[in-house]
Every structure is written in C-alpha cells, then in structure tokens.
C-alpha cells in the first residue's frame, strides 16, 4: 500500500454536486494507513484566491506535522519549488556552515524523510507559487516562515541575506 495518495478532483465533481468531504472521510476510514492529500484541478471554478498551482503546493504539505518536542530549531526546510537548490547556492553553502541542517522535498526518498520536513524550526520558500502554502504550513505548526525569492540583483541578495541572519540569529553570523 502507498503511504500517501494525491487525489485530484476536477470541476465536474463540483458541477454534479459530489460530497467530497464524505468521499475523503470514507477513504480515510477504509484505509487509515494511507494519507489522502486533497488536490484540485478546477480552473473553471477559479474566480479569485489562490491559483490551482498554489493550491497544489499547499496540498502537498498539508500532511506535514510535528510534535512540539521534535521541532529542531537548527533544521530549515526549503519548500515550495519544483527543483532543489543547487549545492553551490548561497543558502546551501552558508546555512550548514552556520550549523543548520537543510532539507528539501526533492531529496526525500521515503515517506519518513518527507515527514521529517515538518520538524524544521524554519520554513523557507524561494519560489512565488510556493509562498501561499508554505506560509500556511508555518502558521499551522507555529514556526518561522521566510520568503526569500531567488534574485540576480546583488542589492536584493544582500538584503535577503540580512533578513535571513536577522531572523535566525546564529551564534557565528556569516
């Protein structure tokens, strides 16, 4: 059995009046060992609010949780992007030097590694479409959230690094 299923409903389910909450409830009762992630493909119903891409990224992290005693203030989960940051990126080089463990969804090979993302003391997002979902995740788990969009402008990079270090307050500020 899979550990999780991303279940996509589409606009036709809304048009015909499906009771989606009942469907999810019954699936969860029949298969308690599986996490059913609620994903939507409803661009026709999209009038305002988050885009379908933002909703998908939010759904991908809704099963992350953490017990308060498992929160690791020295772990940073970088989430929300389609691709892992390059090993030579400033964040991937500087954070470990300051004593932080950096985790990303793209490096998770097991469900357990995925769930470990939720133990981070800080959730960092660099990708605009991921901001909505990661910000809600940080709020739900009462964690620090940082949005530091990727930039090629040196002044912007310097400003974002200042925000990063002022938020984290490491002992040995890089």
Enumerate the predicted regions with their spans.
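An N-terminal assembly and electron-transfer interface module characteristic of large anaerobic redox
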Residues: 1-174
